[in-house]
A protein has these predicted regions:
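N-proximal low-complexity "stem/linker" segments adjacent to membrane-targeting elements
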Residues: 1-22
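Conserved donor NDP-sugar-binding/catalytic core segment of glycosyltransferases
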Residues: 94, 98-110
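Short aromatic/hydrophobic "clamp" motif used to bind/position activated sugar donors
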Residues: 86
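Glycine-rich, basic loop-to-helix element that forms the pyrophosphate-binding segment
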Residues: 60-81
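Short, acidic, metal-binding catalytic loop of nucleotide-sugar glycosyltransferases
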Residues: 21-30
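A conserved acidic beta->alpha catalytic loop
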Residues: 37-46, 61, 90
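Acidic helix N-cap motif at the loop->helix transition within catalytic regions
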Residues: 15-17, 42-50, 94, 98
């Protein structure tokens, strides 16, 4: 069972590395990481490009619709995901190392 983790980002450069590393440290390894950047003006894209196995989606539109932008980011990322399960992670947050494994096992066993 493949897991997709969708990350919506806007100007969270200082948290991205911790966020991605929390996914790289997962005990469950069959996952894809999709990073949607909403036209950040900081160094977010340069930071995320250091992770070669992360799928990057760039929104280059000059819109400022607040939470609607985040919904659009999730919609676009879900459309491009290939996982059986989809997880959402904000770019200024991180997952416990067993989060994905625990949830995948729950779905497999129920």
């Amino acid at each position: 069972m493949k897991a997709s983790v969708v990350i919506a980002n806007f100007n969270n450069e200082r948290y991205i590395t911790q966020c991605i590393n929390s996914l790289k440290s997962q005990t469950y390894k069959d996952l894809e990481i999709i990073f949607f950047d909403d036209n950040s003006s900081d160094n977010s894209l340069n930071v995320i490009k250091k992770f070669s196995d992360v799928k990057i989606i760039e929104n280059k539109k000059q819109t400022n619709f607040g939470s609607l932008n985040q919904l659009n980011a999730y919609r676009e990322s879900i459309n491009q995901s290939t996982g059986d399960l989809i997880f959402f992670l904000d770019s200024d947050d991180y997952f416990h190392e067993k989060k994905i494994e625990t949830i995948v096992n729950y779905f497999k066993n129920n």
